[in-house]
A protein has these predicted regions:
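Positively charged n-region of N-terminal signal peptides that target proteins for export
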Residues: 1-4, 449
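Bacterial N-terminal signal peptides
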Residues: 7-17
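Boundary at the C-terminal end of the N-terminal hydrophobic targeting segment
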Residues: 19-23
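Mature N-terminal segment immediately following signal peptide/propeptide cleavage
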Residues: 24-72, 88, 521
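Repeat-blade elements of multi-bladed beta-propeller folds
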Residues: 30-37, 78-101, 127-161, 194-220, ...
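Short aromatic-glycine motifs in intrinsically disordered, low-complexity regions
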Residues: 43-51, 160-167, 223, 437-438, ...
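Extracytoplasmic/lumenal domain signature
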Residues: 57-70, 102-125, 139-144, 162-193, ...
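Long, low-complexity segments enriched in small/aliphatic residues
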Residues: 384, 388-467, 474-476, 519-522
Length: 635
């Protein structure tokens, strides 16, 4: 049941949370999209309301741009992952490409105002392909008339460069770093081989850029430490550093980095970090000392970087269950009280709903016994946190072998499942091979969810995936990789094992597990109850369309508008959708060039609402890739 619109104070709060950008004159507060997640609180919510459930079926293409920055990986340039969320600020749509170029686009026509090209080396380095999830925007609180770079756009690169350009002209800001470029690798203690890859734009709070990074945490035991940096937005000077690893743990481990987006409580100056797992990802015999920040959501002071609280979501993570998206911040109205809360989605399918001031659970959470490892030197945690409410988005037990996939593989799926170790969620990696469900691409991916602060509804898409994790004894790993390393093998140097991580699919690529493969769910935050849950997306593969009830593997995230509309790409079928927040009913579909795995954006400009998608594709969904930026509006 939808709740009535709250007071104007709530809308004011939403406007405050939308960062330093200003709405155009006459526009309602909260109708820009000035940050990666729509506002600093990572709500992915807009007060724009011109498009409604009644008229959304009339949406038409308003404009599109093709950046030209695309590769299918067949040549010298690695495959591209165009996963950027467009931002709208300064009366301009800005989007960053996988080649680290920035496009400034006129909001109503799609005319390109300017393009910044850093002439970057097109090498994947730490990732399977070329990635950028977009740009960040900052503007001076007291701009100096006639001076350049009073408004700035930032983009990071795979080789650890953070670049600042003038938001009006696209020219480098000479006072930032060295001639507009900051070398973040200067703080990397093992930087020669393992650069800090800046896939996610920095989080901008007042005059501070909060910056995390991604690396090869599966490659070696002592990977770089997962430092988070607080930087001066004007100069790039280091203000503070957050270190997730205790000193003893650093002697034998690394990472626990923050490679995903972050959220900020703008009134309290608190930054919320989704912290990933320590290295190496799939073996923890080298890190028996407690690492409280590993696979956690952690609150830090935006001015100092000091820890306020941490809530660990997985103990001694050996599944690569990184906390992988910004928690959504929302004030929950429950039992006559207003609770400052956050919602943290996870790869395990749990939704952790916490008091964002203390880190304490709002709904029941308990420690439950889990299977133990038999690997050499390993000492897994005897228990893991289990969320009681909301119910997990992904069931605790895997659904069993798909009859169709099994028949198509002449029984291989069922024979393989019988060979693997599986004792439920948190079955650890093993030498014999472990069936992991949900696996690391499952549950909720890096897009996270969206929250409607008025109706108190949280909406999130999730996937159901199974993988095989097999530990490979060091001697065997070295022998078998002497000439060439198989694509699914990872070294974990310094540990007794390498690891093989592969999808549990048959020779046709068909999932060996029963559907569904993807869902979209709405949760009532005041009760923790599921309002509705629907299969999401369609799959056209192996020569036919799968039933709607199967859904699709999903990457990306929804957004919500004031009129109760959910806009989302995220599925395998190269379609974008508008969905009724109250019922889950699809009200509109649009065709795009490739799976739109980036979170969309919406904004008001000159009295008209636009919804913008990046349709770039992703190899997990379809081999098709694209460079399309496309906007829809009413006629």
């Amino acid at each position: 049941m939808m709740r009535p619109l709250a007071t104007a104070a709530l809308l004011t709060a939403i406007g405050i949370a939308s960062a330093s950008a200003q709405n155009a004159p006459g526009e309602r507060p909260g109708t820009d999209w000035a940050t990666f997640n729509g506002n600093l609180m990572a709500q992915k919510y807009s007060t724009a309301g011109q498009i409604t459930p009644e008229n959304v079926g009339r949406l038409r293409k308003a404009w599109e741009v093709h950046t030209g920055d695309v590769s299918d990986g067949s040549g010298d340039v690695p495959v591209t992952y165009f996963e950027a969320t467009p931002i709208f600020a300064n009366d301009t749509v800005y989007v960053g490409t996988p080649f680290y170029r920035i496009f400034a686009i006129t909001p109503d026509t799609g005319r390109v105002k300017w393009v910044f090209d850093p002439h970057a080396k097109l090498k994947a380095l730490t990732q399977p392909g070329m990635k950028s999830r977009g740009v960040a925007y900052w503007q001076a609180a007291d701009p100096q008339p006639g001076q350049p770079c009073q408004k700035r756009v930032y983009i990071g690169t795979m080789d650890a460069r953070l670049i600042a350009v003038d938001a009006d002209t696209g020219k480098l800001c000479s006072d930032f770093g060295k001639a507009g470029v900051l070398d973040v690798n200067q703080w990397n203690d093992v930087h020669d081989k393992w650069p800090f890859s800046l896939l996610q734009p920095p989080t901008v709070y007042k005059d501070t850029l909060v910056l995390g990074w991604a690396g090869k945490d599966w490659a070696l035991k002592k990977a770089p430490v997962g430092l988070v940096f607080g930087l001066d937005a004007r100069t790039g000077a280091l203000k503070w550093t957050f270190n997730p690893l205790p000193p003893k743990a650093r002697a034998t481990s690394g990472t626990a980095d923050v490679w995903a987006s972050m959220s900020v409580d703008p009134e309290r100056g608190i930054v919320y970090l989704p912290v990933s797992s320590p290295s190496p990802n799939f073996y923890g015999g080298n890190r028996k000392e407690p690492i409280p920040h590993g696979t956690s959501v952690t609150a830090i002071d935006a001015q100092t970087g000091k820890t306020i609280w941490t809530h660990q979501l997985v103990h001694h993570d050996v599944w690569d269950y990184d906390t992988n998206s910004a928690p959504s911040l929302v004030d929950i109205h429950k039992d006559g009280k207003t609770i400052p809360a956050l919602v943290q989605s996870t790869k395990m399918g749990y939704l952790f709903i916490l008091n964002r001031l203390t880190g304490e659970p709002i709904y029941p959470e308990r420690e439950v016994p889990v299977p133990q490892s038999h690997a050499q030197g390993e000492q897994t945690s005897p228990t893991q946190p289990e969320v009681q409410r909301p119910v997990p988005l992904v069931p605790d037990r895997w659904p069993g072998v798909s009859t169709i996939a099994d028949i198509a593989s002449f029984g291989w799926c069922s024979r393989k499942a019988h060979e693997l170790r599986y004792e439920g969620r948190y079955t650890p990696p093993s030498v014999q091979g472990t069936l992991v469900y949900p696996a690391t691409p499952g549950g909720v991916e890096w897009g996270g969810g969206a929250v409607d602060p008025v109706s108190q509804t949280y909406v999130v898409n999730n996937s159901y995936t199974a993988q095989i994790y097999r530990l490979i004894p060091r001697a065997e790993y070295e022998r078998e990789t002497r000439d060439k390393t198989p694509k699914s093998w990872h070294p974990m140097k310094g540990s007794p094992y390498g690891v093989e991580v592969k999808n549990f699919t048959n020779w046709l690529g068909m999932p060996c597990w029963k559907p569904p493969y993807g869902s979209l769910t709405a949760v009532d935050l005041t009760t923790g109850r599921i309002l509705w849950k629907q299969p999401f997306g369609e799959v056209q593969k192996w020569g036919f369309y799968m039933p709607d009830s199967w859904g699709s593997i999903t990457i990306g995230a929804p957004i919500i508008t004031r009129t109760g509309l959910i806009f989302i790409g995220a599925s395998m079928d190269s379609r974008v959708r508008a969905i009724d927040e109250r019922t889950g009913k699809v009200l509109w579909r649009g065709r795009v060039d490739a799976p739109a795995v980036a979170t969309p954006a919406t904004y008001m400009y000159k009295g008209k609402q636009y919804v913008v998608f990046v349709a770039g594709g992703n190899h997990l969904l379809l081999p098709k890739v694209s460079d399309q930026v496309i906007a829809f509006s009413l006629p």
